[in-house]
């Protein structure tokens, strides 16, 4: 899982009057403090069995592959449960994919569309992205996996065809705005 939140004590830096800045800060804080974006991944994705900290995959690619596995999960998950618990297993899998996996992707799309106009207006914004991995592997491996998941989120933003997030992530925007993603694996 990857959690994206507003960094509470950070400020948005800009050249607009202070009143406008406070309104923008409040709107973004409400959005990300109250509704953080939670992204879910299939086990050991992206780049399974890799010690790399970066990936070339973007989150949409990993999401699409994960959602295609929903039927497999519905078949396999019940077999791991006691017989009396199997009846609701398919419903639980469907519920997880609808209320967590798909919702996370929908929240990401909403977030990307909402955030971009603030950057276009010259606001610099700092986000915190924290990666999580199951405790099945060694801790140092999970840290690298979490970093790859954060990398897939950044790649998603940079590859959006209708927005140029790259200039804000690489600090090359003509208006001086930046999108800073602090990683907390």
PLM feature spans:
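Extracytoplasmic
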Residues: 34-38, 122-124, 178
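A broad, low-specificity signal for short, low-complexity segments enriched in glycine/proline
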Residues: 2-3, 87-91, 174
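Generic structural motif
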Residues: 4, 125, 179-183
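Pro/Ala/Gly-rich low-complexity, hydrophilic intrinsically disordered segments
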Residues: 1-50, 56-67
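Structural recognition of the beta-strand scaffold that forms the well-ordered cores
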Residues: 40, 126-131, 182
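Periplasmic peptidoglycan-binding/anchoring modules of Gram-negative envelope and division proteins
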Residues: 22-23, 27, 47-130, 154-165
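A generic structural signal for short, solvent-exposed coil/turn residues
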Residues: 31-33, 119-121, 173-175
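Periplasmic OmpA-like peptidoglycan-binding domain that tethers envelope proteins to the cell wall
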Residues: 101-103, 132-185
């Amino acid at each position: 899982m990857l959690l994206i939140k507003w960094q509470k004590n950070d400020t948005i830096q800009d050249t607009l009057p202070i009143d406008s800045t406070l309104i923008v800060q409040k709107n973004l804080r409400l959005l990300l403090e109250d509704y953080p974006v939670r992204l879910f991944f299939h086990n050991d994705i992206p780049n399974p069995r890799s010690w790399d900290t970066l990936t070339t995959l973007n989150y949409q690619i990993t999401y699409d592959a994960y959602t295609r596995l929903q039927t497999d999960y519905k078949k396999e998950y019940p077999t791991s449960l006691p017989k009396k618990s199997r009846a609701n297993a398919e419903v639980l899998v469907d519920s997880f994919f609808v209320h967590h996996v798909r919702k996370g992707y929908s929240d990401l799309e909403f977030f990307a569309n909402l955030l971009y106009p603030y950057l276009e207006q010259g606001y610099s914004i700092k986000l915190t992205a924290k990666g999580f991995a199951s405790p099945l592997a060694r801790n140092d491996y999970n840290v690298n996996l979490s970093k790859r998941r954060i990398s897939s989120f950044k790649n998603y933003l940079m590859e959006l065809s209708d927005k140029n997030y790259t200039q804000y992530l690489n600090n090359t925007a003509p208006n001086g705005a930046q999108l800073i993603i602090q990683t907390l694996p």
